[in-house]
Curated annotation (Swiss-Prot):
Purpose of the protein: NAD(+) hydrolase (NADase) that cleaves NAD(+) into nicotinamide and 3' cyclic ADP-D-ribose (3'cADPR, v2-cADPR). Upon infiltration of A.thaliana with this bacteria an effector-triggered immunity-like phenotype (ETI-like, cell death with severe chlorosis) is seen, 3'cADPR levels rise while NAD(+) levels remain constant. Plant immune responses are suppressed. Triggers hypersensitive response-like cell death in Nicotiana tabacum cv. Xanthi and N.benthamiana when transiently expressed, depletes NAD(+) in N.benthamiana.
Subcellular location: Host cytoplasm; Host cytoplasm, Host cytosol
Misc remark: Identical genes are encoded on the chromosome (hopAM1-1, AAO54553.1) and on plasmid pDC3000A (hopAM1-2, AAO59032.1).
The protein's name in its UniProt record: 3' cyclic ADP-D-ribose synthase HopAM1
InterPro entries given in the database record: Toll_tir_struct_dom_sf
Source organism per UniProt: Pseudomonas syringae pv. tomato (strain ATCC BAA-871 / DC3000)
Effect of E191A: No NAD(+) hydrolase activity, no hypersensitive response in A.thaliana plants, no longer toxic in N.tabacum, N.benthamiana or yeast, no change in plant subcellular location
Outcome recorded upon mutating F210A: No longer toxic in N.tabacum, N.benthamiana or yeast, no change in plant subcellular location
Amino acid sequence: MHANPLSSFNRAQHGNLTNVEASQVKSAGTSSTTNIDSKNIEEHVADRLSDLGRPDGGWFFEKSLGTLKNLNLEQLAGIHDVLKLTDGVKNIVSFGAREGGFELAMQFRHDLYRSQHPDENSPHDAATHYLDAISLQSNKFTKLEKLQHVDVFKMQNPFWDVGYKNGIAHAKKMAFFITPEWLGSDFCKQEFQWLSETKNKDIKSAFVIFKDVDLKSKNMTSIFNFADFHKSRVMMASTPPESGLNNVKIENSVDLNFKRLLTDRESWELNNFLGD
């Protein structure tokens, strides 16, 4: 997601998904070590993490669980599950969750799924179009905590960055919704850094830039330079009064912020890019 290990999202978020999507989210990431000997799981996980490259400052789980050698078998299985889940990522989306960014990403993901699977009952992999708040929801180490006095949960997984980096390593496309909130998030900017550093040289990228972004900022200069060098697609979103996206029904939820919108043409262009 945009991604923040503490991803805020509105109550009954499952309402963003069809029944098929929701059931597959629940089943896609059940922790299992059936295809790897438990005696070798530490070595296997260590090799995979080494190949991904340790982030600046260390893996997120090191802050709460300790180094890889300190992890027990269940925790190692949790990492293995995250890696297995994100090996199938096709597209990955980076967004700032605040000020309507989360709702925009969820709407766009929903429309992208439906364009590829017009039949609501058509099966698909829940992690194909990766938003970490949703795609890691089935992992047993993902925890939800309701924030007091507001209709919002936060989601936390100690292995979120493992999944995100692995998603980038396998994805064919990566799209960024660039907003002031994205630029203000260290997690979002870290995702851009991971794209810059990935060994996946076949990944293509697109940047959807909203009109309230300071185009002359240092961060935007880095993005434009990257996009120019890698021939990324750059779209300037017009932020219309009405969205070209289909509204996603989120039952029993209040105060959703649909500030971030795309026109029909903008939505079609990005959908077409990710759907190739």
